[in-house]
C-alpha cells in the first residue's frame, strides 16, 4: 500500500495502465475472499451471520448515542431506511471490516499482484459486500480527473471507474451488486 509515503511506488507512480491493476487486485481480493467456504475452513465461530444487517444498524446507532456530541440531522431517517431496505440477497461470507488500500500489501513491481490482506481486527463472517461498499463509497466514476471532492490518501488518477470495479467484483465473486447503494 502507499501508506507512509508520498504517492505510489514505481512503476505505479507514472504507469497509469499498471496502476489500474492495483485497483483490480484490491477488488479481486475481497471478491475471492467472499467465495471461501468459511464453514469448511472451521470458521463457524468467527461471526454470527444470522441477523447481521439488523445488528449492524443497532450497533452503530447505539455507538453513536454513546459518543454523540451534537445532533446529526437525518441520522434517524438513514437508520430507518437501512432497516427497511435489506440487501437484495445476503449470502454470508468472510469479510474484513476495514478493507482499503491501507490494509493490503502488493508484491514489488508490475504487474500489480496482491500479496496480503492485513489488519483483521474487524474480520467476521457477515456480508462481504460491506467490504465492497467501503472500497467504492468515495471512489470517483471519472478517474481521469477525479477532482477535489474525491481527495484520497492515494492518487486515483488512472484507476478504473467505480462502475468498472463493481462489474469486476460481480464477475469474480459471482455476486450481484445491484444493491450497492445499501452499502
Segment roles from a protein language model:
Residues 117-123:
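Activation of the activation-loop gatekeeper triad in protein kinase-fold domains
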Residues 104-106:
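Hydrophobic residue at the +6 position relative to the catalytic HRD Asp in the kinase catalytic loop
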Residues 47-48, 176-183:
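All-alpha amphipathic helical-bundle segments outside canonical DNA-binding/catalytic cores
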Residues 130-174:
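Active-site activation/catalytic loop segments of kinase-like enzymes and analogous catalytic loops
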Residues 94-96, 101:
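Catalytic-loop of the protein kinase fold
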Residues 1-77, 81-94, 108-112:
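ATP-binding pocket architecture of kinase catalytic cores
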Residues 76, 84, 168-179:
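C-terminal, non-catalytic tails of nucleotide-sugar-dependent glycosyltransferases
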